[in-house]
């Protein structure tokens, strides 16, 4: 394939398929293999950075962030045995233990929930 006359060279097309960004072809971006690999690495680094931010927040107690008595939302792995047993019945709703026991946390649309990693539960519970 030639690069002239609106055609795309193999060097241009292969990394574009790898990155799955067909819009870049329409914009006329000259996407090379090193550029594509760099873009993938930046995306991976950003994802890992966000994961670490969330993980560090999960280790904070309510008092450390000035939310005494409000409660803390924990992933299902931290929930009590009773909450785990009831998890199947609750579905995507959250349960509250402590001063707000018996009430339900507001439910969130499915699109707002992060997709669980392989082997991870979607159920989440609130604890104080």
UniProtKB/Swiss-Prot annotation:
Entry annotated with the keyword Cell division: no
Organism: Gorilla gorilla gorilla
Keywords, comma-separated and alphabetical: Cytoplasm, Nucleus
Name the UniProt record assigns to this protein: Saitohin
Record GO cellular component, one term: nucleus
Subunit structure and binding partners: Interacts with PRDX6.
Ranges where the record places region Disordered: 77-128
Record's subcellular location: Cytoplasm; Nucleus
Major subcellular site: cytoplasm
């Amino acid at each position: 394939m030639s690069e002239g006359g609106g055609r795309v060279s193999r060097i241009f097309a292969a990394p574009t398929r790898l990155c799955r960004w067909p819009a870049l072809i329409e914009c006329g971006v000259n996407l090379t293999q090193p550029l594509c690999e760099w873009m993938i690495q930046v995306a991976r680094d950003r994802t890992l950075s966000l994961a670490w931010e969330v993980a560090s927040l999960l280790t904070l107690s309510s008092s450390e962030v000035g939310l005494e008595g409000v409660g803390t939302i924990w992933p299902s792995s931290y929930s009590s045995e009773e909450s785990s047993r009831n998890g199947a019945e609750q579905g995507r709703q959250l349960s509250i233990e402590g001063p707000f026991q018996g009430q339900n946390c507001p439910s969130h649309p499915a699109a707002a929930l992060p997709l669980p990693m392989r082997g991870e539960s979607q159920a989440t519970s609130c604890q104080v």
